[in-house]
């Protein structure tokens, strides 16, 4: 891997701010691993995440998905159980799933959806789901009675974005095998969503820096002033 990484690094100039198109072209060239690498976007924002009014979070359906099979766990009861199963949920349940997670440390799922009437039950898992970014949230559309739509969106390639403590958002935008066109489409849809999510309390330059990289490849910096072009 060392040799391949060294070759990849030579293709990228650390001091250059590339256009989106140049960066995406480079990321496909620097993806040299034997597996289909994930391409990740990192955006540093001009917000202070310590303040509640400067949080940036949301969700968006990427036009070409992420290339990843997403396992969905749904907390529901009554007729919502059937609705979730028919919509393609991988796991559906209530109290018994809470116990399974608590007792067996079971996490064979990627996204959790819950109906609002189940949040009292799901709340008991806050300490284990929260740190993993798995807690259902109305802002990201994962606390809803419309479980069929929530599942369909997730399976279609919906990704959540959320600013971390260092004011950076990390989101996958697809696989290296997608090629430049699909990665570019996904990049622009995601960046537009992040720009629209700018909090009113955020002052000064909002998009501070942008970079993309493949799983094993080097970071490629993008000119933050040209991300929507």
Swiss-Prot record:
Binds directly to 23S rRNA. The L1 stalk is quite mobile in the ribosome, and is involved in E site tRNA release. Protein L1 is also a translational repressor protein, it controls the translation of the L11 operon by binding to its mRNA. The keyword NAD does not apply. HAMAP family: Ribosomal_uL1_B. The lineage of its organism: Bacteria, Bacillati, Bacillota, Clostridia, Eubacteriales. This is Large ribosomal subunit protein uL1. GO terms for molecular function: rRNA binding; structural constituent of ribosome; tRNA binding. GO terms for cellular component: large ribosomal subunit. InterPro entries: Ribosom_uL1_bac-type, Ribosomal_uL1, Ribosomal_uL1-like, Ribosomal_uL1/biogenesis, Ribosomal_uL1_3-a/b-sand, Ribosomal_uL1_CS. It comes from the Bacteria. GO terms for biological process: regulation of translation; translation. Keywords: Repressor, Ribonucleoprotein, Ribosomal protein, RNA-binding, rRNA-binding, Translation regulation, tRNA-binding. Part of the 50S ribosomal subunit. Belongs to the universal ribosomal protein uL1 family. It holds the Pfam family Ribosomal_L1.
């Amino acid at each position: 891997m060392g040799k391949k990484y060294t070759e990849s690094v030579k293709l990228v100039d650390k001091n250059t701010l590339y256009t989106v198109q140049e960066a995406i072209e480079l990321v496909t060239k620097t993806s040299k691993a034997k597996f289909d690498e994930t391409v990740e976007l990192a955006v540093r924002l001009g917000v202070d995440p310590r303040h509640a009014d400067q949080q940036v979070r949301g969700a968006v359906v990427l036009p070409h998905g992420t290339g990843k099979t997403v396992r969905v766990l749904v907390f529901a009861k009554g007729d919502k159980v059937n609705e979730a199963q028919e919509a393609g949920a991988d796991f559906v349940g209530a109290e018994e799933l809470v116990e399974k997670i608590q007792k067996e440390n079971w996490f064979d799922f990627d996204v959790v959806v819950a109906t609002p009437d189940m949040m009292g039950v799901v709340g008991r898992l806050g300490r284990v789901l929260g740190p993993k970014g798995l807690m259902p949230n109305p802002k990201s559309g994962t606390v809803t009675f419309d479980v069929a739509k929530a599942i369909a969106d997730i399976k279609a390639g919906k990704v959540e974005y959320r600013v971390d403590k260092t004011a950076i958002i990390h989101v996958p935008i697809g696989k290296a095998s997608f090629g430049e066109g699909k990665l570019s489409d996904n990049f622009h849809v995601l960046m537009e969503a992040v720009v629209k999510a700018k909090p009113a309390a955020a002052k000064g330059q909002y998009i501070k820096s942008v970079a993309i990289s493949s799983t094993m490849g080097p970071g490629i910096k993008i000119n933050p002033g040209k991300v929507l072009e």
